[in-house]
């Protein structure tokens, strides 16, 4: 009996060590939903957290909106005050802010949706590609700011996304967007 317990514990420890070094796969979803197309990728730290790049036909598919999500178990009760607020973040080494645009109750936690804004697609795509290639990562950390403590609202304050397939995914999203019947001509 002790032998089985001994072997089971060693096997469990071995699996935990091996699986902790597993690397997240870069799986992109590129599709159209209603009038817009998007390309999204799952996070490496929290797989369910997505980073999405959205294109709208009314912009002639020339602008890109960026959104990302953070799931949290923390609910201090006043999370609704974050809506429409700019929360301090660090994008790789760059301190900036992201606007909270939606908070959705999910299971026993909350999914907080942020936006970094709307940008001209060519310039933004080039900037993201250059930033990712320079740092070899695309990482967002929610950080403390004036009258804001990140750990009050977020149990995990950091996530990163693989963007190796960013350019082909955006090109595919542009093609989908341009095929929209609602594109301005």
Q: Where are the regions that the model predicts?
A:
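Classical Sec-dependent N-terminal signal peptides that target proteins to the secretory pathway
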Residues: 1-24
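A generic "folded-domain core" signal
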Residues: 22-185
């Amino acid at each position: 009996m002790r032998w089985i317990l001994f072997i089971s514990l060693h096997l469990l420890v071995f699996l935990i060590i091996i699986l902790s070094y597993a690397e997240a796969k870069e799986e992109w979803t590129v599709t159209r939903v209603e009038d817009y197309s998007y390309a999204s990728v799952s996070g490496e730290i929290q797989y369910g957290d997505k980073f999405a790049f959205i294109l709208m036909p009314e912009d002639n598919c020339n602008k890109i909106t960026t959104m990302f999500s953070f799931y949290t178990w923390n609910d201090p009760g006043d999370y609704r005050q974050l809506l429409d607020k700019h929360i301090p973040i660090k994008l790789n080494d760059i301190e900036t802010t992201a606007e909270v645009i939606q908070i959705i109750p999910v299971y026993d936690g909350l999914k907080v949706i942020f936006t970094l804004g709307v940008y001209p697609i060519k310039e933004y795509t080039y900037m993201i590609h250059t930033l990712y290639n320079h740092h070899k990562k695309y990482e967002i950390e929610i950080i403390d700011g004036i009258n804001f403590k990140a750990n009050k609202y977020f149990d995990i304050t950091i996530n990163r996304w693989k963007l190796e397939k960013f350019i082909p995914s955006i090109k595919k999203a542009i093609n989908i967007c341009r095929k929209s019947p609602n594109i301005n001509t």
